[in-house]
Amino acid sequence: MSLEEFDEVKYDHSTKRLDTPSRYLLRKARRNPNGLQELRESMKSSTIYVGNLSFYTSEEQIYELFSKCGTIKRIIMGLDRFKFTPCGFCFIIYSCPDEALNALKYLSDTKLDEKTITIDLDPGFEDGRQFGRGKSGGQVSDELRFDFDASRGGFAIPFAERVGVPHSRFDNSSSQSNTNNYIPPPDAMGTFRPGFDEEREDDNYVPQ
């Protein structure tokens, strides 16, 4: 599929256009037979995708920040498809495309709840896209994460399950090279976790 019309042309002493697809959208378009049309739609869309949110960030906090860029018609919180709890992303629908571009211009890489959020133009929300697509019900990016992040559920899937290695290989009889790679599940760490000894309370968000 040719995406020549979306190739970025760089000029000296110029600023980057906002109504251009991100590298993620370009990769997605190349795998999708209808990708070119979706790219064109996203460039004139009133919808944005917001990623890397804390699981504890509420819809009210998102509205307070993003309403500074225009009139918000709807916010769709991303949910774990099994637990129906927030899983770190959302869609925001503005009343016109210019307001979506305002959000992209002024709020990209902003910190919300101590997380640097990402913003991307979106072709438009469809029912079903609010659910995580990962094996555990959340986002795929969290399942590929190896570090502990309290704002995004702590550890994701145990290391052994992610790489497909039987748990028996991580017992006391395993070789040193194997045990060095083991990442314990959250319940194996006890109640004290360095840097996270004060647990944040779960919010009372109820998906509408």
UniProtKB/Swiss-Prot annotation:
Residues 171-182 have a biased composition (Polar residues). The keyword NADP does not apply. Pfam families: RRM_1. GO terms for cellular component: commitment complex; nuclear cap binding complex; nucleus; perinuclear region of cytoplasm. Residues 46-124 form the RRM domain. MRNA binds at residues 24, 49, 118-122, 129-133, 139-140. It is found in: Nucleus; Cytoplasm, Perinuclear region. One of its GO terms (molecular function) is RNA cap binding. Residues 168-208 are annotated as: Disordered. PROSITE patterns: RRM. Residues 198-208 have a biased composition (Acidic residues). Its main location: nucleus. Signal peptide: none annotated. One of its GO terms (biological process) is response to osmotic stress. Keywords: Cytoplasm, mRNA processing, mRNA splicing, mRNA transport, Nonsense-mediated mRNA decay, Nucleus, RNA-binding, Transport. It comes from the Eukaryota. Belongs to the RRM NCBP2 family. Component of the CBC complex, which binds co-transcriptionally to the cap of pre-mRNAs and is involved in maturation, export and degradation of nuclear mRNAs. The CBC complex is required for efficient pre-mRNA splicing through efficient commitment complex and spliceosome formation. Together with NPL3, the CBC complex is required for export of mRNAs out of the nucleus. The CBC complex is also involved in nuclear mRNA degradation, probably by directing the mRNAs to the sites of degradation. Affects replication of the positive-strand RNA virus BMV. In contrast to metazoans, where the CBC complex is involved in the nuclear export of capped U snRNAs, it is believed that in yeast, U snRNAs are not exported from the nucleus and U snRNPs are assembled in the nucleus from RNAs and imported proteins. This is Nuclear cap-binding protein subunit 2.
